[in-house]
Amino acid sequence: MEALSMVGSGGVYSWPAALLVAAIVVSASVRWWGIKRQPTTTESKARLPRGSLGWPVVGETLAFISAAYSAQPESFVDKRRLLYGKVFKSHLWGSKAVVSSDAEVSRAVLQADASAFVPWYPSSLMQLMGESSILVLGGGLQRRVHGLAGAFFKSPQLKARLTVDMQRRVADAMDAWQCHGVVRVQDEAKSIVFEILVKALIGLEPGQEMHYLKQQFREFIAGLISLPIKLPGTQLYRSIQAKKRMAKLIQKIVQEKREKRMGGNNNATCKAPRDMIDVLMSNGSEELTDELISDNMIDFMIPAEDSVPVLITLAVKYLSECPLALEQLEEENMELKKRKSAVGGTLEWTDYMSLAFTQHVITETLRIGNIINGIMRKAVKDVEVKGQLLIPQGWCVFLYFRSVHLDGHIYDDPYAFNPWRWKERDMMAASSGFTPFGGGQRLCPGVDLARLEASIFLHHLVTTFRWEAEDDTVVTFPTVRLKRGMPIRVSQNIETSGTATFRSTESASV
C-alpha cells in the first residue's frame, strides 16, 4: 500500500524539526559509523550518481526538512538536480540514499520485485506497524493479501454498496452544514471517509464501537511520526497501546464471524463477502491469522486520515481558486442530476465515474497536490537501473514524485491548476510521469475507491451549495494537509443554471 510517504502518514500531527532530527540521531548514529567502517569499493564505481552525503549522522536531512516546511518544498531536490542531474546521492533519515526525480528511473524501481528492493520506513513507524503489516510484508504473503484487497476494492458489488453508503453519509452531513456557519472541509471529509472505509473493511456500522474505534485511531495515527522511544508516557508507546485496543476490537469481530461459520450457518459461509475481513477469512490460508487480519485492517484505515480526505479538500481549494473549472464541474454534475431525476433513477457508481471533467479535476488535484510526496525503498543487493545507475546494497532509494509531477518538461505550466490538460492526454503514456499512489506490486489497492469517494463528495457539494472559501494554505510536511482545514461558508444552491457557485477570499499558489 503506497498511501504512506517516506516519513509515514500523520494527518494533522506535525513534529518540529528539532524532534525529527533528534529521532534521526538516536536511530542512525551507530549505523552511520558502522557504514563508514565498511569498505567503500562499491561507492567508487562510476555508475553511482554524483551528490553529497552532507553532515555526519544527520546527512542532508536538515536541509530537506527546511525545504519541506517552505513554500517550495521541492526546492531541496530541484537545487541538487541542477547540480548533479535528476538522480543524485544524499543521506536522509539516517540512511545513505539515491534520490530520483527521474520518471523512468522511479518507474523501474517501482516495478522491481523484492529480490531487488524492499520497503523502508523510519524506526517509529516500523515499530508501530509491526512485522505482519502489508507495508513491510514481502514475498507470496504480501502478494496474496495485496491481490485479495485489490480484487475486493475493485469489485462492482463493493462499489455499489459504498456508493449507497457514501451518498447517505454525505447527504446527512451536508444537511447539518447550514447550521454550522463555517464548515471545515478537511474535518468533515475525514469523518465521512473513515466511517465508510471502516464499514467496508470490518463491517462496523456507526455507533458506540465506531466512536471508540475512531478515538483509538486518532491516538494511533499520532505515533506514525514520533521519536522512536517506546517508553511509558511517550507518543510511540501511547500509539502502540491504542493499536492494541483497536486490534482487540477487530479480533472480536473476526472471532464472531468465525463462530458463525463454524456454527453451520450456510448462509454465513456461502454468501458473497460483505467486507474485507470476509475476503481474508474466505481465503482459507493458515498464514492469514487473526493477528495478521486485524493488523492489516488498521493499516488499511490510514488512507481515511491522509489520502482521500486530503484529495477532497485540495479539490475544493483548487476549484475555489479556478472559477472556470468550478463552473464546468457544476454544469456537468447538474446535467447528470437532472437526467437522473427526469427518469426517476438513482445515481450509481458508474454514473459518477462517467463524469469526464470531474475525473480530470481529481487527476489534476492528485498531480498538483502531491498527497504522497514520495516513497523509499531499500536495496537488498547492488542494483543496476536501466544499465546506467547503481544503487548499492543497503542504500535507500527515495522516489520523489513531487518533482516529477511539477516538471516543466513533462507538464506545460506545471504549477497551474489545469484540469483540461487531461482531456487529450493519454493516461497510459503519461503513467511514468504520473504516480500519485505509487506503482508496481505495492500500488495502493484502493485507488478506484478514492476516485469514487471524491466524485460523490464533489457532486453533492456543487449541486447542493454555493460556498465562500476562507484563507488557507497547503502544508506539505510531514504530510500534506490544509493548515486550517479548508474553512468554507456555505449557502443553499437554488440556481441550476450552471453558474459558478464560489467566492474565494484568497487566490493562493500551491
Swiss-Prot record:
It catalyses: 3-epi-6-deoxocathasterone + reduced [NADPH--hemoprotein reductase] + O2 = 6-deoxotyphasterol + oxidized [NADPH--hemoprotein reductase] + H2O + H(+); (22S,24R)-22-hydroxy-5alpha-ergostan-3-one + reduced [NADPH--hemoprotein reductase] + O2 = 3-dehydro-6-deoxoteasterone + oxidized [NADPH--hemoprotein reductase] + H2O + H(+); 6-deoxycathasterone + reduced [NADPH--hemoprotein reductase] + O2 = 6-deoxoteasterone + oxidized [NADPH--hemoprotein reductase] + H2O + H(+). This is Cytochrome P450 90D2. PANTHER family: CYTOCHROME P450 26, CYTOCHROME P450 90D2. SUPFAM superfamilies: Cytochrome P450. It comes from Brachypodium distachyon (Purple false brome). Keywords: Heme, Iron, Membrane, Metal-binding, Monooxygenase, Oxidoreductase, Transmembrane, Transmembrane helix. It is a single-pass membrane protein. Its cofactor is heme. GO terms for biological process: brassinosteroid biosynthetic process; brassinosteroid homeostasis. Involved in reduction steps of the biosynthesis of plant campesterol-derivative steroids, ending to castasterone (CS) but missing brassinolide (BL). Catalyzes the conversion of (22S,24R)-22-hydroxy-5alpha-ergostan-3-one (22-hydroxy-campesta-3-one, 22-OH-3-one) to 3-dehydro-6-deoxoteasterone (6-deoxo3DT, 6-deoxo-3-DHT), 3-epi-6-deoxocathasterone (3-epi-6-deoxoCT) to 6-deoxotyphasterol (6-deoxoTY) and of 6-deoxocathasterone (6-deoxoCT) to 6-deoxoteasterone (6-deoxoTE). PROSITE patterns: CYTOCHROME_P450. Pathway: Plant hormone biosynthesis; brassinosteroid biosynthesis. Its EC number is 1.14.14.147, 1.14.14.-. Belongs to the cytochrome P450 family.
